[in-house]
Amino acid sequence: MSGNGGAATTAEENGSMMRVIRVGTRKSQLARIQTDTVVAMLKTLYPGIQFEIIAMSTTGDKILDTALSKIGEKSLFTKELENALEKNEVDLVVHSLKDVPTILPPGFTIGAICKRENPCDAVVFHPKFIGKTLETLPEKSAVGTSSLRRVAQLQRKFPHLEFKSIRGNLNTRLRKLDEQLEFSAIILAVAGLQRMGWQNRVGQILHPEECMYAVGQGALAVEVRAKDQDILDLVGVLHDPETLLRCIAERAFLRHLEGGCSVPVAVHTVMKDGQLYLTGGVWSLDGSDSMQETMQATIQVPVQQEDGPEDDPQLVGITARNIPRGAQLAAENLGISLASLLLNKGAKNILDVARQLNDVR
C-alpha cells in the first residue's frame, strides 16, 4: 500500500501478489505516449510492480473553441487529474511540466522531473509551402498558434505574417493544417512532435534567439500527493539533476513575475561549466514592447544523493530530496533575482497592460 493509504493495491500474477500503482493521464495520444514513457522507466526500475494507466479528460481538453489564455483558469490540464489524486483513485499523474502551475494546490507536489527533450518551438508547414521558412512565406500568410508567448515574439520579427489561434490536440492541428487552406504553417513544440514520431514534419526550428520557449517546455513531470512518502521515494529517482535545476530557475522566474498563460513570458536556460545561465523576457501582446535580461549563478550539476530531511519544503511545487538542497536554492534564487531585475525595470507595466488587453479581447 502507498504511504498514506492511497490507491496502490495488489493484484495476483502467477500465484503471487503484485503491487499495483495507478497512473493518471490525459486522454490525448501525446499524453498517453508521455505517460507510457514514464511508466516504461518505472517498470525497468521496479519489475515487481504492476502499473495501471487511467486516462481522463481535462478542462483544457474539453474547451476547444477558446484560446487557453482566455479561459481564465490556471490548472486547465491538471485539475481533473489532481482531483483523482486527492480521491486516491490514482497514485501519480504525468504532465507536460509547462502545463503545471508554479503554485500547486495544497497536498500535491511534483515528485519527479524527467530529462528534458528539445525545449524549442518548431514550424510545421502546409504541404505546398514545404521548403519555406517563416521569413519566406508569402505576405499575409496565416500561421496557427494559440500561444501569446509565440505571437508576441514572432509578430515583431515577421510583420508580413498573420498569426491566428488554433486549438485542439496535435493530431487535430496537423489535420487542420493539411486538409484546410486556412493556415500556411502552424507552430508546435519540438518535443511533442518528436514524441509522436513526427520529426519529419519539422520544417524549421525556432532557436531561442528567434523565439524563447515556455517555462518547463520539453520536460515531463510526475505529480504525487505531497505526504505520500512511499510514492515520492519511488518516483524521485527519475529526477534529472540538470533538468530539475533549470526548471526550478524557470519556474521561480515565472512565479515571481506572477505570470501564466495569460501573459507573454519566455525563458532560455543553459548549464555550462558549473554556471546556470537564465535568460527571461516579457512582452506586450503585439511584441512592440519587451524586456529581456540574462543572469547566471554558479551551480555544479549534482549527482543524486541519499534523501535529505523529510521536512524539506517544496521549491516552486517540486520535491527533490535526493538532489542537494543548496543547488536547488541557488537555482530558485537565480529565477527570483532575474524576475526582480525585470520588475525593477518596469516589466510589471508591460505585464499588466498585456493582462488587461487579453481580458477585453
Curated annotation (Swiss-Prot):
PANTHER family: PORPHOBILINOGEN DEAMINASE
A Gene Ontology cellular-component term: cytosol
Primary residence: cytoplasm
Pathway(s) annotated for this protein in UniProt: Porphyrin-containing compound metabolism; protoporphyrin-IX biosynthesis; coproporphyrinogen-III from 5-aminolevulinate: step 2/4
Cofactor(s) annotated in UniProt: dipyrromethane
MF term (GO), any: uroporphyrinogen-III synthase activity
UniProt-recorded name of the protein: Porphobilinogen deaminase
Entry-linked InterPro entries: HemC, Porphobilin_deaminase_cofac_BS, Porphobilin_deaminase_N, Porphobilinogen_deaminase_C, Porphobilinogen_deaminase_C_sf
Residue positions, PTM N-acetylserine: S2
Localisation per UniProt entry: Cytoplasm, Cytosol
Purpose of the protein: As part of the heme biosynthetic pathway, catalyzes the sequential polymerization of four molecules of porphobilinogen to form hydroxymethylbilane, also known as preuroporphyrinogen. Catalysis begins with the assembly of the dipyrromethane cofactor by the apoenzyme from two molecules of porphobilinogen or from preuroporphyrinogen. The covalently linked cofactor acts as a primer, around which the tetrapyrrole product is assembled. In the last step of catalysis, the product, preuroporphyrinogen, is released, leaving the cofactor bound to the holodeaminase intact.
Gene coding for it: Hmbs
Species assigned in the record: Rattus norvegicus (Rat)
The protein's Enzyme Commission number: 2.5.1.61
Catalytic activity as recorded in UniProt: 4 porphobilinogen + H2O = hydroxymethylbilane + 4 NH4(+)
